[in-house]
C-alpha cells in the first residue's frame, strides 16, 4: 500500500510498501513517532483516505472498489472509528450523538443507542450535551457511537491522548473489555508503548513503513 500528499509541486510519500494482515478478533496497536504515518495508515484502513496503490479488504470486500454510496454504507455497517478529540456534535445530546450512525443508515436506533450508552456506563447522562460532560465521559460517548452498529472492526486514533492518566486507564479498560466481549477486531494508534503491551500484537511504524511487528508476550 502506498499513500502520498502533494505540498505545492512536491510529493511527500507518507506510506510505502505497507503489507498487513489482521486476524478477526485480533487487537493490534500501532506505535511510532509523530509524523511516522500511523494516523494516515489508520485512515486508509478505515476507508477514510484512498491509497494511490494497493487495496484494503475487510470481511472479504475490497473497500475501495465500492462506489461512494456503497462504501459509506459498508463503513457504517462494518467499521467503528474513535477519534482522539471525540468529534461529538456540540448541539446534540449524548444519545443523539450515538444515534448519528443509525441516522445515516436511515433507521430509528434510539433503543440501540441507549443500550450502547449503558454499556459504557453513561445511560444516566443520555440527555446531556457534550459541554456538560467531562473529557472521559465524552470519549465514552464516542466509544458508544462507534459500537452502536456492532461493527466487526473498530479503529481508534489515540483514544486516550486527551485524557489524564486515571481517565486514560478507565477508557482503555472499557475499550479492551468491550472489544473482547464482542469479538471485535481492534486497531489502535498510540504513542504509549506501555499501553500497546495490552494488545495481541504491536507494530512499529517508522517513516511510512512497518519496521517491526511482534506478538505481545
PLM regions: where:
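H-loop (His-switch) and adjacent beta-strand-loop-beta switch element
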Residues: 202-215
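ABC family nucleotide-binding domain
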Residues: 1-205
Amino acid at each position: 500500500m502506498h499513500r502520498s500528499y502533494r505540498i505545492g509541486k512536491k510529493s511527500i510519500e507518507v506510506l510505502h510498501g505497507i503489507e498487513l494482515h489482521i486476524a478477526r478478533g485480533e487487537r493490534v496497536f500501532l506505535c511510532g513517532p509523530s509524523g511516522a504515518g500511523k494516523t494516515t495508515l489508520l485512515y486508509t484502513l478505515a476507508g477514510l483516505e484512498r491509497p494511490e496503490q494497493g487495496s484494503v479488504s475487510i470481511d472479504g470486500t475490497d473497500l475501495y472498489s465500492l462506489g461512494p454510496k456503497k462504501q459509506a454504507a459498508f463503513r457504517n455497517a462494518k467499521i467503528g472509528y474513535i477519534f482522539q478529540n471525540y468529534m461529538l456534535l456540540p448541539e446534540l445530546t449524548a444519545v443523539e450523538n450515538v444515534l448519528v450512525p443509525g441516522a445515516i443508515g436511515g433507521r430509528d436506533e434510539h433503543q440501540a443507542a441507549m443500550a450502547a450508552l449503558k454499556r459504557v456506563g453513561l445511560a444516566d447522562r443520555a440527555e446531556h450535551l457534550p459541554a456538560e460532560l467531562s473529557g472521559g465521559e465524552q470519549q465514552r460517548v464516542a466509544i458508544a457511537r462507534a459500537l452502536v452498529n456492532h461493527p466487526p472492526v473498530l479503529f481508534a486514533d489515540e483514544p486516550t491522548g486527551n485524557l489524564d492518566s486515571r481517565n486514560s486507564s478507565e477508557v482503555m479498560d472499557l475499550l479492551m473489555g468491550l472489544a473482547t466481549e464482542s469479538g471485535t477486531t481492534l486497531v489502535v494508534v498510540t504513542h504509549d508503548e506501555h499501553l500497546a503491551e495490552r494488545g495481541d500484537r504491536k507494530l512499529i511504524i517508522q517513516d511510512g513503513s512497518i519496521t517491526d511487528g511482534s506478538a505481545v508476550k
